[in-house]
Amino acid sequence: MKTLLLSLVVVTIVCLDLGYTRLCLSDYSIFSETIEICPDGHNFCFKKFPKGITRLPWVIRGCAATCPKAEARVYVDCCARDKCNR
């Protein structure tokens, strides 16, 4: 009985997320995705991509403490959910 109780306590500690951490995509394609664990205080995911370019545009994804500002000819999408920056 003690062994079962100890096992349950260990499993609970391992599985319990004591602090919430945002998960953002740092790379994404239809074939794969790379997830970034954001540091404390970085509660937003973002995606930057060029305006008006239709072929093979570059895309920058990551975590941010605040939403990045849009630049000339660059769109910025910002969101506050896990892996929302597809």
UniProtKB/Swiss-Prot annotation:
Identify one Gene Ontology CC term for this UniProt entry. extracellular region
The places in or outside the cell where this protein is found are: Secreted
InterPro entries given in the database record: Snake_3FTx, Snake_toxin-like_sf, Snake_toxin_con_site, Toxin_cobra-type
A single GO molecular-function term is: toxin activity
Tissue and organ distribution:
Expressed by the venom gland.
Q: What is its main location?
A: secreted
What is the recorded name of this protein? Neurotoxin-like protein NTL2
Name its species. Naja atra
